[in-house]
């Protein structure tokens, strides 16, 4: 805002130059304005009262003369162009038509400009002197909205983070969360639309991310010493760092603080500037209006309000007299309407009366308090409330500053002098002491007095040098009678010199400043005469005193008196200029105050003083007639003369300047003559446009400053509350219908107010309802219903990701309110449910249509679509469908909590639309292909975890669709596995593969994969799922049984083909077959057991089969080992006593030993057997995976071996063992015993009775042999010894 006291002449010169240029330009073009020049005239100098040849087109409406002088048809004819050139258009009629349209357009623009200027005058007055409203401090702060450019910047920052281009350290979980947020939220077209609608703020982005990560963090595993809340806080801090980028957080915080402050309280200058922008007012126009309206003068503004309120009361009386009422819904409301008008004015009067009588500079908008308890003023009783003299006591502050004294010539230079000062009846003050050679002080004394004409005494003293002197000597004195209008600067005054002072020309320089009390509006000397007071024509000192906002008094004072001598209460008087009265001498400029039965004549000494007095009294009387001076001495002159002659006050100067520029009509217009309903409608609409285009995400909410101005305008100009809210609703609806984000809570407030008013509930105390209000309300109610239903239908796009927070819930609440027939009876829930159901059914179609369209855009329609591609697209579409349903649950379910069953229906409808595309894709798939199972798994995994959708309509359809496929798949898999078993065992090499053979591994893998696949389907229908499980368990049992039997047969065949001598080595295949049994037993536990307690039959059956088979295999292998042992014993049987071989062998050895050293029978047989046993033990121990089976095998093998040896010895009980037999057996038995003990066979098994029998027999035979054989057994003995152990090793 420009300073009102700034120089006006410069802007005036600029305006005059522009005006001159325009006129010249018009003349040069043959009195025809070009469109561009016309625009300049309209924008820059419109309203200046142009009188040039063509000024009427551009600015004729502004000054009142342009339209008549320049608006004639001659100036617009094509033939009037300068130079007589060929016309640019071949058709003059076409040209004239265009120019006519241009003229009409310019006239409309001019009318609009005038309307805005007039509206700005009313708004300025509301800002300058508010007495009804204040800027609210409890409104929620609106966050700054995100622009398209800022959204792109945020996207780039997150993309840079994901690309690793930032310094922010993050783990994989956070990276995944940000990636998901970036893809789902930031890149969403719904977010772009929200930004475009002006409803997206940084807080929205942050809250969506916070909600997005909460589930992720909750699902993370617990970490010791690290709480989930800590992780959340850390992630949010990193998010903020990414979102902020490289920007200094301190700058951002400072900017946010500043913006928040501007959202709260605005100064007057800021409010002026805001509404200049809203109404398109230029700075110089504001300056002219500001000065001419005297907006910095609270007295003038209060007087303007009083005049307006008086005019509104008169208008109410006129309406009552002429019966020009608005059309009400009831005839009885007409009288009530008049009462309401008067009551509203009385309330405003009470508010005005409660305002403090203060200066404009001390007035603060935010300190304004509205008085609701002030008594209502009854204008009819004002004359009875007479003032007493004590009611108008004034208090003045005086400053007396003594500067210096001149004329002290007789005093010695070093004599001390000083001054005293006093106000009559008050205390006395003294200056510092000074030497007579330099009597200067600059001392100020402050006094207060209740005298309107106080006497200020200043005395000059010098210190007495005499010994007997009791008092200092007075040199001189001066007595002054200051008034608030006296000069404030220091002046020289001649002092009255004391008798004994030789210096007769003493002067003192001092200043006396008398401040004007806040309730003193003007003062000065006037000549006056009246009928009831001031009955003699005499010059008196007058003070215009404001007792309250509605009570003023003209008081005359004498010197040294606190109370007025006489006073005149100005209620009901009208002041005006008059001509000089004959017979009254004294006074030059006359004016009077007239009231029925009384006239008071005043006269001042000059014209300027008269104008000031009339202006002050005009404000005080509250009269509607504005006095106009008969002659205006002050005229606008060139700058050089302006400063030299100022006979009129500055307010008249500004008024003249405003008149010159065509502004006087806006300033002097009577507000009561305007249709403030339409004017307010305009200013509210323009304010809303301005608000929606500022940098805040306001959602339609006005700023506190805007609310304040609109509130004040409505109160001051009598705009009905219902009209205000109906206009607001209409404007908000228009914006919402055009895509702007509007807070439904705001709509709810205004709608509830209007509904309450229309149904007679008097929300603002107004009981009258006009037909227009009711009709408009019904129209807006229908529009609002359509809008709300449309928003609910498009809830994913109108409230993306649940933003703004709570908006969808508020929309549903508002819809319920709109559906109410009145404000008392709640609408039946079924009716609301029907409406919402219809909306959500349409929403399903809208959401799926947009989703499928989005999917097709991604899939590049136009390519040849194969069944596989169609299935792939359907799976992608299913992922998007699930994502939509999850977002609905996450962001919108809370709003629909009261209608959760309808949201379930919405989801089912949405899925049914998808089912059509899904069925079509599955129909074209070739038979016996299983690529569609991932689609089932994807959908079923989502549906089965949703309480509302599990086993719902679509879920059952999905099961019905895939159940035959699953059955067919299991059948084919069973056949395939059976064939693989048959073929596999035919070609089985029994080479070890993992835990078994190739065939068994393949079998178990297929069975496990099949069961895992079916289990991962998580079939939701319990009975069919149980059937599938039983089917697969039975299949596994049958397959494993077949595997076990085939292995048992192969085992036996393999053993039959192996050697029966000690050369036998346990082949790898034998161990593999054992391992197949081991693996079969382990797999059967997993593959054949049912979870239910009564369903263990499959598992127990196959378990028993495996155990029996393993026993048989162990028995067969032990039998093989026994056969080999029997072969060894058969060789030893040759040495039985009495046999031919034994006799021949003994004879041959004895005969040969006489000639050569014949070697005795060695231990080859025993060593071969021991080697066989050890090798077989090692192979079995190393290759067979089941320890229990090894132990059982070794136990049985040991026992069987001992039994065979024992039987063999028992058969030779009557025979003495040959020395060779004895040595071989001792070695075999001892080594077998030790080897089996090393393999872990228990001592209880090793030291069996059979073993003891064998040991005893061999011990006895050993003793016998040692007696009969001279050489003994050559160190072989049943006794244990270390040497033997070393030898064996």
Curated annotation (Swiss-Prot):
The domain of life is Eukaryota
Compartment(s): Synapse; Cytoplasmic vesicle, Secretory vesicle, Neuronal dense core vesicle membrane
| UniProt region (Disordered), positions on chain | 1-107, 1264-1289
Q: Which CDD domains match?
A: PH_CADPS
Cystine bridges: none
**Molecular functions (GO terms):** calcium ion binding; phosphatidylinositol-4,5-bisphosphate binding; protein kinase binding
Q: How does it assemble?
A: Interacts with the dopamine receptor DRD2. Interacts with RASL10B. Homodimer.
Please provide the record's free-text comment about the domains of this protein: The PH domain is essential for regulated exocytosis and binds phospholipids and plasma membrane. It however does not mediate binding to DCVs.
Q: What is this protein called?
A: Calcium-dependent secretion activator 1
Give the encoding gene's name.
Cadps
């Amino acid at each position: 805002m420009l300073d009102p006291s700034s120089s006006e002449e410069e802007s005036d010169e600029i305006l005059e130059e522009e005006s001159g240029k325009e006129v010249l330009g018009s003349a040069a073009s043959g009195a025809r304005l070009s469109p561009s020049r016309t625009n300049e005239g309209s924008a820059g100098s419109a309203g200046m009262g142009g009188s040039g040849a063509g000024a009427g087109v551009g600015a004729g409406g502004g000054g009142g003369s342009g339209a008549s002088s320049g608006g004639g048809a001659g100036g617009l004819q094509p033939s009037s162009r300068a130079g007589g050139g060929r016309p640019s258009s071949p058709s003059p009629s076409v040209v004239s038509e265009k120019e006519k349209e241009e003229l009409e357009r310019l006239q409309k623009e001019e009318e609009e400009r005038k309307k805005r200027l007039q509206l700005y005058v009313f708004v300025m007055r509301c800002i300058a002197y508010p007495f009804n409203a204040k800027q609210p401090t409890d409104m929620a702060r609106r966050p700054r909205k995100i622009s398209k450019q800022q959204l792109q910047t945020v996207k780039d920052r997150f993309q840079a983070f994901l690309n690793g281009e930032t310094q922010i350290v993050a783990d994989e979980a956070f990276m995944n969360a940000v990636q998901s947020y970036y893809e789902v939220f930031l890149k969403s077209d719904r977010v772009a639309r929200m930004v475009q609608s002006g409803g997206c703020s940084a807080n929205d982005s942050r809250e969506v991310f916070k909600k997005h990560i909460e589930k992720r963090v909750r699902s993370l595993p617990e970490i010791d010493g690290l709480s989930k809340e800590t992780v959340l806080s850390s992630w949010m801090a990193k998010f903020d760092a990414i979102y902020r980028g490289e920007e200094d957080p301190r700058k951002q915080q400072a900017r946010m603080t500043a913006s928040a402050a501007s959202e709260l309280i605005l100064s007057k200058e800021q409010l002026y500037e805001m509404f200049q922008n809203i109404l398109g007012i230029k700075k110089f126009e504001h300056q002219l209006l500001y000065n001419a309206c005297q907006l910095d003068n609270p007295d003038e503004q209060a007087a303007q309000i009083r005049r307006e309120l008086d005019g509104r009361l008169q208008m109410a009386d006129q309406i009552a007299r002429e019966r020009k009422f608005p059309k009400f819904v009831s005839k009885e409301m007409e009288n009530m309407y008049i009462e309401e008008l008067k009551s509203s004015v009385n309330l405003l009067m009470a508010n005005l009366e409660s305002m403090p009588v203060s200066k404009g500079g001390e007035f603060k908008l935010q300190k304004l308090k509205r008085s609701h308890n002030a008594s209502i003023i009854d204008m009819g009783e004002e004359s009875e409330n007479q003032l007493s003299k004590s009611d108008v006591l004034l208090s003045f502050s005086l400053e007396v500053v003594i500067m210096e004294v001149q004329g002290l010539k007789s005093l010695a230079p070093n004599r001390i002098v000083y001054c005293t000062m006093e106000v009559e009846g008050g205390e006395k003050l003294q200056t510092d002491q000074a030497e007579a050679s330099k009597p200067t002080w600059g001392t100020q004394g402050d006094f207060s007095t209740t005298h309107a004409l106080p006497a200020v005494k200043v005395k000059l003293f010098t210190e007495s040098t005499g010994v007997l002197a009791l008092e200092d000597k007075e040199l001189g004195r001066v007595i002054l009678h200051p008034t608030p209008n006296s000069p404030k600067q220091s002046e020289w005054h001649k002092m009255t010199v004391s008798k004994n002072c030789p210096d007769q020309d003493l002067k003192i320089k001092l200043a006396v400043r008398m401040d004007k009390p806040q309730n003193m509006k003007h003062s000065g000397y006037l000549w006056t005469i009246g009928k009831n007071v001031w009955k003699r024509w005499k010059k008196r000192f007058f003070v215009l005193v404001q007792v309250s906002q509605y009570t003023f008094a003209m008081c005359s004072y004498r010197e040294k008196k606190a109370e007025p001598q006489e006073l005149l209460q100005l209620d009901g008087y009208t002041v005006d200029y008059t001509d000089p009265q004959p017979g009254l001498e004294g006074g030059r400029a006359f004016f009077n105050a007239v009231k029925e039965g009384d006239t008071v004549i005043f006269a001042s000494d000059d014209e300027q003083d008269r104008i000031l007095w009339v202006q002050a009294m005009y404000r005080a009387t509250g009269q509607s007639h504005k006095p106009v001076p008969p002659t205006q001495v002050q005229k606008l002159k060139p700058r050089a003369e302006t400063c030299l002659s100022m006979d009129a006050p500055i307010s008249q100067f500004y008024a003249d300047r405003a008149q010159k520029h065509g502004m006087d009509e806006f300033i002097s217009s009577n507000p009561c003559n305007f249709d403030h309903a339409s004017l307010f409608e305009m200013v509210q609409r323009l304010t809303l446009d301005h608000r929606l285009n500022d940098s805040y995400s306001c959602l339609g909410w006005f700023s506190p400053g805007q609310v304040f101005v609109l509130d004040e305008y409505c109160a001051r100009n009598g705009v009905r509350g219902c009209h205000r809210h109906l206009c607001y609703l209409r404007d908000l609806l228009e914006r919402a219908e055009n895509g702007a984000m509007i807070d439904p809570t705001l709509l709810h407030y205004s709608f509830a107010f209007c509904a309450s008013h229309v149904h007679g509930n008097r929300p603002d105390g107004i009981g009258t309802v006009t037909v227009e209000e009711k009709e408009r309300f019904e129209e807006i109610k229908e529009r609002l219903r359509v809008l709300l239903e449309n928003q609910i239908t498009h809830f994913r796009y109108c409230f993306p990701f649940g933003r703004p927070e709570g908006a969808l819930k508020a929309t549903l609440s508002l819809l319920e309110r709109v559906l109410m027939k009145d404000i008392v009876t709640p609408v039946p829930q079924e009716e609301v449910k029907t409406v919402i159901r219809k909306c959500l059914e349409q929403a399903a179609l809208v959401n799926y249509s947009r989703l499928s369209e989005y999917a097709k855009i991604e899939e590049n329609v136009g390519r040849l679509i194969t069944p596989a591609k169609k299935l792939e697209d359907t799976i992608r579409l299913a992922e998007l469908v699930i994502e939509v349903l999850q977002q609905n649950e996450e962001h919108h379910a809370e709003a629909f909590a009261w209608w959760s069953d309808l949201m379930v229906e919405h989801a089912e409808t949405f899925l049914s639309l998808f089912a059509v595309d899904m069925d079509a894709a599955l129909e074209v798939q070739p038979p016996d292909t299983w690529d569609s199972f991932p689609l089932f798994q994807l959908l079923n995994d989502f549906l089965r975890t949703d309480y509302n959708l599990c086993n719902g309509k679509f879920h059952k359809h999905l099961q019905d669709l895939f159940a035959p496929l699953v059955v067919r798949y299991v059948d084919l898999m069973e056949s395939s596995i059976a064939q693989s078993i048959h073929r596999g065992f035919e070609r089985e090499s029994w080479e070890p593969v993992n835990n078994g053979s190739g065939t068994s591994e393949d079998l178990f893998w297929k069975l496990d994969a099949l069961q895992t696949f079916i289990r991962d389907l998580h079939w939701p229908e319990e009975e069919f799922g149980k059937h599938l499980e039983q089917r697969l368990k039975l299949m596994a049992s049958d397959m494993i049984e077949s595997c076990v039997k085939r292995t048992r047969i192969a085992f036996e065949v393999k053993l039959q083909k192996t050697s029966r001598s000690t050369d036998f080595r346990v082949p790898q295949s034998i161990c593999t077959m054992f391992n197949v049994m081991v693996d079969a037993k382990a797999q059967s536990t997993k593959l054949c057991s049912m979870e239910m307690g009564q369903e263990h039959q499959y598992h127990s059956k196959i378990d028993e089969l495996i155990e029996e088979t393993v026993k048989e295999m162990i028995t067969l292998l032990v039998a093989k080992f026994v056969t080999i042992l029997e072969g060894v014993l058969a060789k030893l049987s040759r040495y039985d006593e009495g046999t031919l071989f034994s006799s021949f062998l003994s004879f041959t050895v004895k005969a040969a030993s006489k000639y050569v050293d014949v070697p005795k029978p060695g231990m080859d047989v025993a060593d071969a057997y021991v080697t066989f046993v050890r090798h077989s033990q090692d192979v079995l121990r190393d290759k067979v995976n089941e320890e229990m089976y090894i132990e059982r095998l070794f136990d049985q093998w040991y026992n069987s071996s001992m039994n065979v040896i024992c039987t063999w010895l028992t058969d030779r009980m009557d025979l003495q063992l040959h020395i060779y037999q004895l040595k071989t057996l001792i070695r075999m038995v001892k080594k077998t015993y030790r080897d089996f003990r090393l393999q872990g066979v228990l001592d209880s098994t090793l030291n069996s009775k059979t073993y003891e029998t064998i040991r005893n027999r061999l011990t006895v035979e050993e003793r016998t042999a040692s007696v009969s054989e001279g050489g003994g057994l050559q160190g072989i003995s049943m006794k244990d010894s270390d040497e033997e152990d070393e030898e064996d090793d």
